[in-house]
Amino acid sequence: MTDWDLSKEDYPNARAVRETIRSFVMELSDECSRSTIEKLAFGTVSLSDPDLELGYKSEDFTRRFLVDDLLDAVNLEYRPQPTADSSNEDHYPDFELSNTVIPVVGEIKPLNNVSAGEDQIRTYLSLSSFDTPYGILTDGMEWRVYGPDRSGSGYAIQNQIRLDNAFQMIAHDRKIISESGLSSIIRQQGVSQITDFVRTFKQEEFDDWTLISLPKPERDQYLPDDYESQSSFEDFQ
């Protein structure tokens, strides 16, 4: 049994994250060779590589078998492809969180190709028609949360979580990665990455830290009167 460094109430979320990655690895095993999965696990090839022939578009595969289920694992609800309120703007993020205090937009890229979406997520955040200071950019392996930078005139990464070591650990457990390809350090880091993912993205924790990170005047725009953790914000001005 994995000794998660989490409160007991968060154990189901951590197990759900681990199971999602395991299921994704098994889906990959139906589409790719073991050597290709090992390269994907260690980031030496992208799922968008033209030499890989999948039954889906690489971005759709990443979303359907990894990103959607990881969001579910941490109790985040979402709606696909929200549209800007202005008819003059034709920009469509891949999803928008719908059960968080702040409605966060998100962009998905194929596994190991997260940087390809950086310009897009910044564009979405610059649109006044999306009422959010935050955006998530992910390829399933790496999760970046963008928010206002210190100058207040742009956007920067506020939080960043990787799941590559967790992917490697689970692929090894499924006998897809060889014994020589995994160290005990990677295994320890894999468990830590799952823990960090839950602590960062579980809905209640996500609400708390995204609110705390905002300046008080902007935070007050989103903070409900009956928010359960409201007293914890008194020291954050």
Residue positions per predicted region:
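A short, conserved, highly charged catalytic patch centered on acidic carboxylates
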Residues: M1-Y134, E142-Q237
